[in-house]
Amino acid sequence: MLALAGAQTAGAATVGPAAEQAQEQAERAAGTARSGDVIATYKGKKINLTANGWGTAGNCTEFPDLTVQCFDREDEEKAATASYKKAKKGTKDAIADAPAGRSDLTAQSATAGAMAVQVDGDGSGCTPYGAVRLWEHTWYYGRQLTFYSDGSKNLGDYTFRDQTSSICNNDESGGAALYDWRTGMPDPQIITGWVGCLGNLHSYSYPYGGDWGDKADELTM
């Protein structure tokens, strides 16, 4: 669940932009459960996403227990997620079953200025219940990165910094915010509403000029 940092309260002391930025980043970082390099399992071997990137993988998922698995295809990811759900059911690291009225989230087929999804695999905007999913390219194409655990994610740790061009939020509750880290000023954010997608971040204006495509340094959910 996203909790927005830096909310103003009555009587709060006035701070400069740099101090405000540092305070907000510290508050968000307090929600980070992971430390150190991100080590993933891919084709039965360990790979260091932080130091060495994805290799030939096209799809990586961080599960609630913070383990990361990478895959070549989306059907492999779906099978691994089903196995994880079965193994972790009833534990603190379980993936919750969707309640009545909720399910996997699927965006609609591509039209100008709208969300888009084409087919399963590349171009799919399907996002499992309880997850937030990022894509490398617009309209849900390219490498995809999925998160189930709430908190702040330094996308550089996953070799995904400045690489997000579309996002879907199907978390259990709350929004999902992408942040761009700035020096000496508050970090801009763009929020994806609960049970929603932004299929083309290049179409959203960025506060300091340009657009939001390939700008995100951090995800908070």
Spans of features found by a protein language model:
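Bacterial N-terminal signal peptides
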Residues: 1-5
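Compact beta-sheet-dominated domain cores in extracellular/mature segments
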Residues: 6, 13-221
